[in-house]
């Protein structure tokens, strides 16, 4: 993995797990509004690190824990997981220790897809992500709901480093069709599973609610996959601060709690 950090180590820490097809730097637009108050850690999965081999979620979690200890992090105020980053964040939070006082899952989290469909998806996902590098971001609109110039560099960097083997190994232990990881009731009460009302992954919401009955399940009305984070990083950062400092979501007209 590769790690970036922003802010003062003496401040409460926020750990970000990034989405599929991008690097950890994709959280930088949000972190820009947090780094004065929080110590922000942005790991990039080995899937998107040149010369590294993805060995599974357990190994990824181990690398994150080693880095946090080396940085002297004693408190994780918040863990933020975007899209498929939820699979890694879930494994991280299920471990004892620095699991995070609050967690915010943004979009498409904990999707359940069988092994057969995942095998079929593999070559298409690989070509889609690599095409973003080959086309310098020109194919983004074909695989995502937007083609904002601000996010293209993160897709391009990820596509450059991606290998077929790493993506195959990641999908083999992510998006599993099976029982979700258990979370204690108290942890669920401080966990937010957010969905955009018009994103394709909204169909997984009922299964997540059933698995974590004590959690929080805000719906971002008329929002696409990770739209608030991409289009309004300052607003998204302010929302994260509200979760940390007040243990609640802010009152926003498009959020249905």
Model region roles, listed by residue range:
Residues 80-89:
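Gly/Ala-rich beta-loop-alpha elbow adjacent to hydrolase catalytic centers
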């Amino acid at each position: 993995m590769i790690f970036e950090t922003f802010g003062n180590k003496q401040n409460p820490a926020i750990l970000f797990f990034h989405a599929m097809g991008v690097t950890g730097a994709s959280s930088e637009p949000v972190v820009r509004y947090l780094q004065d108050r929080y110590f922000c850690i942005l790991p990039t999965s080995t899937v998107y690190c040149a010369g590294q081999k993805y060995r599974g979620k357990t190994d990824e979690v181990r690398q994150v824990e080693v880095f946090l200890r080396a940085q002297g992090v004693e408190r994780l105020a918040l863990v933020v997981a975007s899209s498929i980053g939820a699979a890694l964040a879930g494994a991280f939070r299920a471990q004892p220790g620095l699991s995070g006082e609050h967690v915010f899952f943004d979009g498409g989290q904990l999707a359940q897809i069988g092994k057969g469909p995942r095998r079929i998806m593999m070559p298409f996902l690989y070509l889609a992500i690599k095409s973003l590098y080959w086309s310098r971001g020109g194919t983004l609109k074909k695989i995502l709901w937007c083609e904002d110039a601000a996010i293209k560099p993160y897709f391009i960097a990820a596509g450059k480093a991606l290998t077929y083997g790493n993506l195959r190994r990641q999908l083999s232990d992510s998006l599993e069709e099976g029982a979700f990881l258990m979370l204690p009731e108290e942890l669920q009460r401080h966990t937010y599973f957010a969905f955009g009302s018009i994103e394709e992954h909204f169909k997984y919401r009922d299964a997540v609610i059933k698995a974590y009955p004590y959690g929080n399940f805000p719906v971002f009305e008329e929002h696409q996959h990770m739209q608030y984070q991409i289009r309004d990083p300052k607003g998204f950062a302010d929302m994260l601060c509200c979760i940390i400092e007040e243990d609640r979501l802010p009152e926003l007209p498009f959020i249905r709690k």
